[in-house]
């Protein structure tokens, strides 16, 4: 991938950009095999990759510069701002949005937040695009509600320029810390969720719900999980850390009992909406802590699917799964180190299948999915 920002030394986020994709995949596979070296693996499936540029469905832009000349991008460690509107990881459809946002920031008088001086209002711009219809969700992260009336007043101009903006919100993040969002979300549009579709499964994205940033690879990840589950004698499963329900909605069949658990209520609202559209009455989603939910249950499903954050599922849940001993565990992870650590805490299981998904090209990161079978 050619990147003018990298060539000019202005951005180093894609640390592996100079390596061809096949070399990157080889290095990631070697890393994964090294992490799982202590465990016999029955089958290594071929790694899955997608486009090497223009694949991201989300931009998280730090807003800096001045209200007349805002910059959208990032801050270097020394506080120097960098405009990343030309980042080749973004699809071409993002360029007109960035181009319209800069004059809009001036029109609405949204002074960029200055970290050093602790002054200003507009901290971040968060943009998400749906692959299914090109609709977009735009979030303005502000320090306070001071400029909210001005923003509302100027908004019709932006909506006229960018009719693809289906969901627009303001998020209030009052803390002087590098935290992307606060708890308060104010909707400026009637529509509150962005419609998405992977493999004919309807999905919804709400402002504070996690959604994978590489749709081409994520859709293959979900389809693979569905294929693995269909090959197993499973009538009852849990989907823990389920997010908007991507895994559960793909794996569920009309006669399967499936419970999806996720701590973020916004994500659960999305999952419930999808389940209703699919008419899956035996599929239920609840906004709870995954570990607390699992350890309080006496009824054990045949399969537990986990897709935890980078920290992994942790010892309490590993201990519980070891004791309750579901026949199958599918572990999807964005951090193979913590996954390997967790598998070590599940001594009664063997690894039947492992597959790497290159969700984050040009970096050392990757997603991995593992099928564990009770011995």
Swiss-Prot record:
Keywords for this protein: 4Fe-4S, Iron, Iron-sulfur, Metal-binding, Methyltransferase, rRNA processing, S-adenosyl-L-methionine, Transferase
Catalyzed reactions: uridine(747) in 23S rRNA + S-adenosyl-L-methionine = 5-methyluridine(747) in 23S rRNA + S-adenosyl-L-homocysteine + H(+)
Protein's name in the database: 23S rRNA (uracil(747)-C(5))-methyltransferase RlmC
Residue numbers binding S-adenosyl-L-methionine: 212, 241, 262, 307
Alphabetized GO MF terms: 4 iron, 4 sulfur cluster binding; iron ion binding; rRNA (uridine-C5-)-methyltransferase activity
HAMAP family: 23SrRNA_methyltr_RlmC
Pfam families, A to Z: tRNA_U5-meth_tr (PF05958)
InterPro entries assigned to the protein according to its UniProt record, in alphabetical order: 23SrRNA_MeTrfase_RlmC, MeTrfase_TrmA_AS, MeTrfase_TrmA_CS, SAM-dependent_MTases_sf, U5_MeTrfase_fam
Source organism: Shigella sonnei (strain Ss046)
Catalytic residues (UniProt): 334
Record's function text: Catalyzes the formation of 5-methyl-uridine at position 747 (m5U747) in 23S rRNA.
The EC number(s) this enzyme carries: 2.1.1.189
Domain of life: Bacteria
Family according to the record: Belongs to the class I-like SAM-binding methyltransferase superfamily. RNA M5U methyltransferase family. RlmC subfamily.
Residues at which [4Fe-4S] cluster binds: 3, 11, 14, 87
GO BP of this protein: rRNA base methylation
């Amino acid at each position: 991938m050619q990147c003018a920002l990298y060539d000019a030394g202005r951005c180093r986020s894609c640390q592996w950009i100079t390596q061809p994709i096949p070399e990157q995949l080889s290095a990631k596979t070697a890393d994964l095999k090294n992490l799982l070296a202590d465990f016999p693996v029955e089958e290594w499936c071929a790694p899955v990759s997608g486009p090497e540029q223009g694949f991201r469905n989300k931009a998280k832009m730090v807003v800096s510069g001045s209200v007349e000349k805002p910059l959208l991008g990032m801050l270097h460690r020394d506080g120097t701002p960098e405009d990343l509107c030309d980042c080749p990881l973004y699809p071409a459809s993002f360029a007109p949005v960035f181009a319209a946002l800069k004059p809009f920031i001036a029109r609405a008088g949204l002074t960029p937040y200055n970290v050093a001086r602790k002054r200003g209002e507009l901290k971040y711009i968060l943009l998400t695009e749906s692959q299914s219809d090109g609709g977009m969700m735009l979030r303005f992260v502000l320090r306070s509600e001071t400029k909210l009336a001005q923003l509302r007043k100027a908004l019709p101009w932006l909506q006229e320029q960018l009719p693809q903006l289906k969901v627009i919100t303001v998020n209030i993040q009052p803390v002087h810390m590098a935290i992307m969002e606060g708890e308060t979300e104010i909707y400026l549009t009637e529509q509150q969720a962005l419609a998405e579709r992977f493999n004919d499964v309807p999905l919804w994205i709400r402002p504070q719900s996690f959604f994978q940033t590489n749709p081409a690879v994520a859709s293959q990840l979900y389809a693979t999980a569905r294929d693995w589950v269909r090959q197993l004698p499973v009538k009852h499963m849990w989907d823990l850390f389920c997010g908007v329900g991507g895994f559960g909605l793909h794996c569920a069949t009309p006669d399967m009992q499936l419970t999806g658990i996720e701590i973020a209520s916004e994500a659960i609202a999305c999952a419930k909406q999808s389940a209703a559209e699919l008419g899956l009455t035996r599929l239920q989603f609840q906004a709870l802590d995954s570990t607390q939910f699992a350890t309080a249950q006496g009824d054990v499903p045949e399969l537990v699917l986990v897709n935890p954050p980078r920290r992994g599922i942790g010892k309490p849940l590993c201990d519980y799964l070891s004791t309750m001993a579901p026949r199958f565990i599918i572990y999807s992870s964005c951090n193979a180190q913590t996954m390997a650590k967790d598998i070590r805490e599940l001594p009664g299981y063997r690894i039947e299948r492992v597959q790497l998904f290159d969700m984050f090209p040009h970096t050392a990161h990757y997603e991995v999915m593992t099928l564990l079978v009770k011995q």
